[in-house]
Each structure stands twice: as structure tokens, then as C-alpha cells.
Amino acid sequence: MLAIFLAALLFGFAFNVSPGAVFSETLRRGLTGGFRPALLVQLGSLIGDAVWALLGLTGLALLLGYEQVRIPLTLACAAYLAWLGVQGLRDAWSPPLAAEDAGEQGRNAFGAGAAISLSNPKNVVYWGALGSALAGIVDGTPNQAQSLVFFAGFMLSSLIWCFCCAALVDWLRRNTSLFWHRVSYAGCGVLLLGLAGLALRGL
């Protein structure tokens, strides 16, 4: 069981550290509001991580093979990512004032993180691969206890990363110039728009 738990920790860190939509939104909000909004985005994303993990481990991910499920979910994902991308470009053009905008950033940061994570069906592809990896670790079909240990290890690593990522973004906010903030906002906006385009391309 220890080997399963440690493997899940490593896979979880690999999943969370890779840049993507959640990190981009964490950076955008954290540069304005600091640690709390950045942390809330990360914590919100745990909802989606947990849902996709359970779907992947239980085999319910097969539902995404149906066009009636996959297409609306992908369209919603693309639309939301595009909207966030436009917000990022807007912030690059006219950076928000931290004192005025921090409260607004904090209020909906948790929901933004959850929405990004829940609306991204590509997460289940990763979990399909992890399911195969888990089967290799246990040398067969994992039982319920083994799956739960793997899930717990993954979620623990995700929770640890939430605080590490938020602290990093807050440090960047305090120790970098406004020019760097604007470049970061623009980069996040372009990345989010690119991810929206990739989502549509997969239809």
C-alpha cells in the first residue's frame, strides 16, 4: 500500500506542476489579489480533480465516448477558457489595482477554479493513463482499497501543491515589477485562448 500511496503522490505532483488553465488563472488572480485568491482558485480546482479522478478510477469516463455528453462539455470548456483569456488580455492592457480589485478576485476565485477543472474533459485522459499505471503497480486489477489509497495520495499531493503554488504566485506579486505583471497577464490570456482553441479543435 505504501508503494501505491507514494506513486500517487508523485503522479499528483506531476499532474499539478504542469502549466495549464488552472495555473494561468491562479497567476492572473494572484498577481492582483495575492495569496488568498490564488489559493482559492487552486482549492476550487480540487473539486474537478476529485470528480475526474473518481470517474477515471471507476470507469465512468466511458460516458465521454458519447457525443451527446462530450460535445456540450467541450463547448462549455472552450467558451469559459476563451472568456478567461479575454479577461487576461484586458488585465494586460489595463492592470487592475490590487487594493480595489482584491475583494472581487477573492469572491469568485474558488468557483473559477472549480469551473475550469470540471469543464476540462481532457483530465480524464490523464486518469485513464493513471488507471493503467495503477494496474501495473499492483500487477493486476486494483481492488477498492488500493484505488482509495491511490486516490488519497493523489489528492494529498494536490492539496500540498495548492498552498505551494499560491505562495509562489504571492511571492512573484510582491517581488516583480508592474511590467512583468502585464507580461504575465498577457501570457495567461494567450495561453487560455490557445487552450480554448485546442478544445474546439478536438471536436
Curated annotation (Swiss-Prot):
It is a multi-pass membrane protein. One of its GO terms (molecular function) is amino acid transmembrane transporter activity. One of its GO terms (cellular component) is plasma membrane. It is found in: Cell membrane. GO terms for biological process: amino acid transport. Belongs to the Rht family. The keyword Membrane applies. Pfam families: LysE. This is Chemotactic transduction protein ChpE. The chain crosses the membrane at residues 3-23, 46-66, 69-89, 123-143, 149-169. InterPro entries: LeuE-type.
